[in-house]
Amino acid sequence: MTLEELVASDNAVQKMQAVTAAVEQLLVAAQRQDRLTVGVYEAAKLMNVDPDSVVLCLLAIDEEEEDDIALQIHFTLIQSFCCDNDIDIVRVSGMQRLAQLLGEPAETLGTTEARDLHCLLVTNCHTDSWKSQGLVEVASYCEESRGNNQWVPYISLEER
């Protein structure tokens, strides 16, 4: 491996770590500001009613769920809709870390009902210009990935 290859590899690792941290920061901020839609069904409803408010779509899946055909079909439809509406998309693994970031599911009538974390939409208010640094960094990463013909970039959220 040449020096240039080593430097490029180190830069790629640092970039991935920065984008992962930006996604985590963005999710926490969006949830706190009530700008996060969680769940495949809820995401589909929102994109049908107000697609212009959506600024980022995260499709989350772990390796053991990759064979879930129904989920893959949902993802394909959501990706298509996002591409048609110029919504940035990121594929994410690390469902447990995602659950940690978004908090434990609320208890409903004595039973714990797990939320569907497979699709997350970050929305932007039409009335203000809400832009977090995390959103800017993730959008930049998505644009850079599209320039490299990777239309749906992938990141891995690591448990802590």
Swiss-Prot record:
In myeloid precursor enriched BM cells. One of its GO terms (biological process) is positive regulation of apoptotic process. Pfam families: Ribosomal_L7Ae. InterPro entries: GADD45, Ribosomal_eL30-like_sf, Ribosomal_eL8/eL30/eS12/Gad45. GO terms for cellular component: cytoplasm; nucleus. The keyword Transferase does not apply. Keywords: Apoptosis, Developmental protein, Differentiation. It comes from the Eukaryota. The keyword Zinc-finger does not apply. Induction: By cytokines. Belongs to the GADD45 family. Interacts with GADD45GIP1. Involved in the regulation of growth and apoptosis. Mediates activation of stress-responsive MTK1/MEKK4 MAPKKK. This is Growth arrest and DNA damage-inducible protein GADD45 beta.
